[in-house]
Amino acid sequence: MKKVFILLALKYYILNSIIRNGENLYKKIVIPTDGSDVSLEAAKHAINIAKEFDAEVYAIYVVDVSPFVGLPAEGSWELISELLKEEGQEALKKVKKMAEEWGVKIHTEMLEGVPANEIVEFAEKKKADLIVMGTTGKTGLERILLGSVAERVIKNAHCPVLVVKKPKKE
């Protein structure tokens, strides 16, 4: 009986810390996805939170144009762009299916630009309360050269960011 009371008290405390003045803090959640395992893991967390707090979810895929700046517009860029958009549609389809299975209202959108910038701007435009995203955990030279999209989103976002790490293989 004591354990049940403690668990109920803990749940009450958590719910009260997330709900202010009778209003849910999480009404709109943004899920940036790239189709990777870690981004799908992040989507699971986001959808679970959305289900618990009756929030809407916005799944976005950003076609990263930064590596292709300066390439001739015709020919190669168009082909690459189409391939990236197809990849994006598949990634968004997976997240949408997951949300629909959980009964969570979802919107999907494809964007073009620098991923961190687009994610932050989209979240601000939608007045998101939370961004949930995955991170691959780059280290060393790779991180110095490429940076971390998640790190830049954390630094620039107007709302909290939940970052889900790649699960360790057992």
Swiss-Prot record:
It holds the Pfam family Usp. SUPFAM superfamilies: Adenine nucleotide alpha hydrolases-like (SSF52402). PANTHER family: STRESS RESPONSE PROTEIN NHAX (PTHR46268), UNIVERSAL STRESS PROTEIN UP12 (PTHR46268:SF6). Belongs to the universal stress protein A family. This is Universal stress protein MJ0531. The lineage of its organism: Archaea, Methanobacteriati, Methanobacteriota, Methanomada group, Methanococci.
